[in-house]
């Protein structure tokens, strides 16, 4: 499966032994070339995460973070605090082609009150979790404006239990929001 291959490549990416910027550039290019076929859709192939075999609706919830935080999350087996009372997740899928990353950051910042979402790189990566019995749906909604001016509504969820089991982490990767 592409997700397993991508996860494997992501965990193999080690730069601690790299001693020069040329080596780092070469290492990153090789890693990028290895994972490119795993993350880019083929001709007439959708990138919608729900069509890649993920469950729909309340089944998958997404955490948006930067890459270093995501890696700490994986290795530590816990969610980061990105909300006043724990971890904020949402049902906004990471391959939403009609929403820009800036708009996603605005919505996350508004929903969480977390100043870190002012920088788009703070939400360039996602982790998808399946643990609906451990989250609370918040009363507010996250309203985003699409690239066509349409109002899109997503639900924020909170988890105060920050530890997670390995099987609850379904996928992770780089977000593919609209550029703009």
UniProtKB/Swiss-Prot annotation:
Its EC number is 3.2.1.-. The keyword Flavoprotein does not apply. Coiled coil: none annotated. GO terms for biological process: carbohydrate metabolic process; cytokinin biosynthetic process. One of its GO terms (molecular function) is beta-glucosidase activity. Hydrolyzes cytokinin glucosides thus liberating free cytokinins. This is Cytokinin-beta-glucosidase 3.
């Amino acid at each position: 499966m592409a997700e397993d291959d991508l996860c494997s490549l992501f965990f193999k990416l080690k730069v601690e032994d790299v001693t020069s910027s040329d080596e780092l550039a070469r290492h990153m290019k090789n890693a990028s070339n290895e994972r490119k076929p795993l993350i880019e859709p083929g001709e007439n192939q959708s990138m919608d995460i729900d069509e890649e075999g993920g469950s729909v609706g309340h089944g998958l919830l997404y955490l948006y973070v930067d890459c270093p935080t995501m890696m700490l999350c994986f290795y530590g087996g816990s969610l980061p605090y990105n909300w006043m009372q724990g971890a904020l997740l949402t049902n906004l899928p990471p391959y939403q082609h009609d929403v820009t990353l800036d708009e996603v950051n605005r919505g996350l910042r508004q929903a969480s009150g977390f100043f870190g979402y002012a920088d788009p790189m703070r939400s360039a990566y996602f982790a998808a979790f399946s643990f609906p019995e451990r989250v609370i749906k918040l009363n507010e909604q996250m309203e985003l404006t699409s690239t066509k001016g349409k109002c899109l509504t997503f639900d924020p969820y909170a988890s105060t239990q920050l530890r997670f089991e390995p099987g609850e982490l379904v996928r992770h990767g780089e977000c593919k929001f609209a550029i703009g």
